[in-house]
Amino acid sequence: MKDRKSHKLKFNPYLEKLYQSDKPLIIYKVDNGYDIYTDFSKKINLSKKNIHKFLNSFERMKYKKETDQYVGFFGYEILNYLLGIKISKQSKNSFYKGVFYKPETIIKIRDNISIFSNKKKQEFNNYFKPTKILSPFKLNIKYQKYKKIFDIFSKKIRQGETYQIKICTKYRNKSSINPINFFWRLMKSNASPESFMIRDKNYSIVSCSPETLLLKKGNKIITKPIAGTLRKSKKSNRSSALKFFRNNIKETKEHNMIVDMERSDLSRVCVPGTVKIDKEKYVEEYRHLFHYVTTISGSLLKGMTIKNIIKSMMPGGSVIGCPKVRTLELLNQQEKENRNIFTGSFGYIKFNKDMRFNIIIRSILNYKNTSEISAASGVVLDSAAKKEFNENFIKAKSLLELFK
């Protein structure tokens, strides 16, 4: 069935025209297919001045049709601002803090293609952007610098200021990319549950994120934290990976801490006693690695707002550390570059307040002819610096391969 859907996506005449056009568009992988958003009537660039107004606006909106929603992303820095955490980092390429779009056309690709559109006539301007690689990838910090940050955080862990913290490294090159081409290649080689692509006039994002941060339908909310990574080998399988995670003290500690933190985050917005683990400590398999996952759910308190839920759940604890606020403060003291999209969240908010957001990891950001790929691995009390540094490369590998 997956191949059949891929075939329809690739060769449907309408979609081919859309892919080859200059229209901004978004593709989001869903459980049984893909949703494509385009013909945007509004584009909201988030900032400190408008983030509260944007989130509060959903309390007054009415849902009448499928296109009554916003789709887009929150960057890492704007989420810190929402929590009242100061950031003094600088970025070579100052990127958007977050962008949300109001679509007038949504194309749902399942066994068949369904189009929901407020546009009477579809117009396409032919456009094709080839991929150009102008320089090789360079890592923003070498191992010696990483080790220095690692040692600082290890000391903070021994002092009890944090229990786990995730150090970010970036691969960066000079390039322009065709995001449509990159996205479908990635879906063929490394499709993940929360994959997405954004093609805008002056930037693009391609992601094979595996992690669902929150899924809200009505008063029910679900989160699926990932904590635990194992590199694949020729002999490994899900059973051997599960055995490894269960027998590995470091991985078990890390997973338990993150699950407890996500349960705590949910408890702040849910009815007391309703937060529960639906599926505990199972393995998901990807091209280069295995992940250790738990599914948690709860029933939202009556009258809970979109802003309250976002502030409670973001940034996702599994890619930050524990406890969240103090760990964010420590990270921002040591990381000298903006994370931009990395460890932010992409998804949609419907006018009926249903929403779905991932954690933005395993992603390429292309902006001003520069591509950057970020990765982060967890530091706990008994972590080894070299192993965590190398794990970042494993996580970035499937994206780096797209540029070959």
Spans of model-derived segments:
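Extended alpha-helical targeting/anchoring segments
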Residues: 1-404
